[in-house]
């Protein structure tokens, strides 16, 4: 097993790099609800993230740095982490799903981190899956993990990437209410409950996207703003023909709480 070796210096450097990287490629990272996370007290805390793209890893990292006042860790396939060991310095550790011993090590290591008060960010679907595929299905690892840690709170996190009114796509994130599991819950029951919870958040996120209902989202990270691509082209042609600069500006219709921006 490859254990995490968190480095504050590497975390700070990676945060700056990833923030710039996301700003160049996306219009915004938007969060719903636009407020602090629901209180869970000192309970062990897990974030269960939908997994439609490799971008989810970076989105989870950015949210962990901005929303959670805890040390954060995330498991990764052992073969992948062996190739990119530098990620261990960001709080990533390995899991070998192909062996009983590997799963046992994962459960032991993760349980220890949770009991230390850390937050765990996990993609329980286990593989990249389209946002809107139904039903949502998890691998069994999360259910087994939750069953071993009485009192753990699990927050479902739905993530989608959509082109709306801008040339670059939006990252849209919907946080669900924490689900708390006490001692005695069966792993299969836990898995089904959390599958339904994440599916509910994905459906709510889909409905907001279809309705273009962005007023309830907060801007966590803002990229370069512009008008829609069509108007950009039309005004650019007009400016070229007339020789006059285009004075138009485009306002952000989404709330932008300063506590989230970085």
Label every PLM stretch briefly.
Residues 35, 78, 96-98, 158, ...:
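Residues at the C-termini of beta-strands that transition into short coil/loop
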Residues 41-100:
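Catalytic core of membrane glycerolipid acyltransferases/transacylases, capturing the structured
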Residues 21-28, 51, 96-101, 131-134:
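Short, flexible loop segments at the rims of nucleotide/cofactor-binding pockets, characterized by
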Residues 31, 74, 92-94, 154, ...:
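Conserved beta-strand scaffold positions in the cores of enzyme catalytic domains, especially
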Residues 11-51:
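Helix-to-loop junction immediately C-terminal to a conserved catalytic motif
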Residues 15, 81-83, 166:
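Short, glycine/polar-rich helix-capping loops at beta-to-alpha or helix-loop-helix junctions
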Residues 2-6, 43, 104-262:
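Non-catalytic C-terminal accessory region of glycerolipid acyltransferases
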Residues 23-26, 69, 87-89, 149:
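Short, well-ordered coil/turn elements that cap or connect secondary structure elements
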């Amino acid at each position: 097993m490859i254990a995490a070796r968190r480095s504050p210096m590497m975390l700070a450097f990676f945060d700056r790099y990833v923030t710039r990287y996301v700003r160049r490629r996306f219009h915004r990272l938007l969060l719903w609800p636009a407020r602090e996370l629901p209180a869970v007290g000192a309970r062990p805390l897990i974030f269960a993230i939908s997994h439609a793209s490799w971008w989810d890893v970076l989105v989870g990292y950015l949210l962990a740095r901005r929303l959670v006042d805890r040390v954060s860790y995330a498991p990764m396939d052992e073969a992948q982490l062996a190739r990119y060991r530098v990620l261990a310095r960001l709080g990533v550790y390995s899991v070998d799903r192909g062996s009983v011993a590997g799963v046992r090590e994962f459960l032991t290591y993760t349980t220890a981190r949770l009991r230390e008060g850390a937050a765990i960010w996990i993609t329980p679907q286990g593989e990249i899956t389209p946002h809107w595929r139904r039903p949502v299905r998890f691998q069994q690892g999360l259910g087994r993990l939750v069953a071993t840690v009485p009192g753990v709170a699990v927050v479902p996190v739905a993530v989608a990437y959509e082109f709306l009114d801008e040339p670059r796509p939006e990252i849209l994130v919907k946080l669900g209410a924490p689900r708390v599991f006490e001692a005695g819950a069966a792993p299969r029951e836990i898995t089904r409950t959390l599958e339904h919870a994440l599916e509910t958040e994905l459906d709510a996120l889909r409905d907001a996207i279809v309705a273009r209902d962005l007023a309830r989202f907060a801007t966590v990270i803002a990229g370069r703003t512009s008008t829609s691509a069509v108007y950009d082209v039309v005004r650019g042609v007009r400016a070229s023909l007339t020789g006059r600069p285009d004075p138009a500006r485009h306002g952000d219709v989404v709330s932008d709480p300063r506590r989230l921006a970085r």
